[in-house]
Amino acid sequence: MAYINEINVTKQGDSIIFLDLNQSPAERAQSDHIRTLGIMGLHQSAERMGLPSTTMHWASYWDQEDVIKYIDKWLKTVGSTRPIFGFSNLFGLDIFGSTTEQPSNITLANKIKENFPDSKLIVGGPNPVCVTKPLVKLDALFYGRALWLMERWLQDKPIPKKNEDVNEFGIPIFFNDVAVIPEDPIVPDLHADYCLNEQDIVTFETRLGCKFNCTFCGYEFRGNKDPYNANEDHVLAFFEEAHSHGITRFSIVDDTFNEEKSKFDLMLNVTRQLDFQPRIVGFNRFDVLAHKPDQIGMLDEMGFHGHLWGIETFHPQASKAIRKTARTDKFFKVLEHIRDDYPHWWVTGSIIVGIPPETTDYSYEMAKRYIGEGLFSGVNLHALMVRKFAEGISESDADFAKDPMKYGITLTGKEHKDDMYADWTTATSSYREAEICKDRILKLGLRNGIGPVNPWNALSKDAIGHELFTTAGKERMAAGVKANHHIDNAKTYFTESWISDWELLIRNYVNRKMEYVETL
């Protein structure tokens, strides 16, 4: 553990506490408990600089008095009087503004500032845009993958003008160039500070960036033409260290794992040296898998058994519009093969309704087939979303958002000014029609025992004994979904089925953290 030494050379602070925040209200329990890679990477950076640092996973769900108690004890232990609080949030817009879904985050941040007035508050994440004026005094915002920018900020080093600005509320913001990879993939060391146990799921990257450039995607490192992989020895050491904590479940957070064979080679070389069988989940492109079926066996061998497949559409022309290649009959044959021969896989199909020129009738007909034939374990459904508050500054907006008319999308301007997504129409659909169709497909899925359960949800349930990577386990869940298909709010059943597990996980983790801080 690093204690105060030479770090007082920085004007920013003399320690840093990273808090993992979530947008979901406490009464709508989290459906997974994956350890967030962001704050592990940030913590690793701070440790490397000699800056005392600690992490607080799932801080939104701690009792707030416990948050203050832990911070106070830790700061006194390391002798810090000018702490920096780094709030990390995945996919959350306006987390401290009036449109937030989790107002208790505002209460928490203000309570921290009240108790530690000589502190600074910074926010990072894939898209930490302030849609409305923050109700918390913030000192900086770090957009996207910004470890290197935070490091320079912490050390008072110059930041390139093209990577900084000030937003409309006067808060300094820092962001990356598009498709320029500024740092290595994160393969974290597993510090005692994380208080891990055998129910945890830890994350890592084999590569930062994605070589594809889908028109609906706003990922800042898409279209990457100069990729490089994580160090194989580091990945092996990570798996072995995790297993020393009893951990056998992992999440690869690459944007698209199966984009290139070298990543398969890396993971096969690593997993063949392990003395345990890992269970891995992550993102893969289904069209690539369908055209390279040899990937299926390699994924199975390495333990990559949980998949979120960005299929998006089965419509050949619509798939061309997003720079993918749908071959309807071929897709269904591959899905049938995986259903029949890989029952120990959890596969979630991610579908976007409304991509032109696909009609909602076509979307629903396809859904009747993939749901009726049980080709997915879960479904991830969205109407086509055109973000209003994407990063913009770094030109990382999706092509659909940059130039919608080019793709036959007309923005109507009829949405509320604070809505996250623009209202739209096309020659074949509209945002409203796509939303209605999406809800119809979701209800169809529920009636057939297929819910909005992604592989991270499934792996989390598996980690606490529900065995969702078995035929019997999936059948039990399907029976529960069918029995509750009448519930109007599709998330209610899943909240009820997860909440007791989630509350127990958080309580046990907080207890471990409180015991840990007493040992320092």
Predicted segment positions?
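Radical SAM [4Fe-4S] cluster-binding motif and immediate context
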Residues: I34, I181-T348, V353-I355
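Short, electropositive alpha-helical surface patch
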Residues: L138, G144, D265-R272, T359-S377
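Non-catalytic positions within long, well-ordered alpha-helices that form the structural scaffold/packing
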Residues: P134, H243, D300, I371-G372
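Flexible glycine/acidic-rich beta-alpha junction loops that bind and position SAM and/or redox cofactors
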Residues: P25-A29, F91-F96, N127-K133, F212, ...
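Acidic, low-complexity intrinsically disordered segments
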Residues: A2-E241
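Radical SAM enzyme core and accessory elements
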Residues: M1-L21, E27-R28, R48, P52-T54, ...
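A general structural detector for well-ordered alpha-helical segments in enzyme core domains, enriched
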Residues: L42, Y70, W74, E101-I112, ...
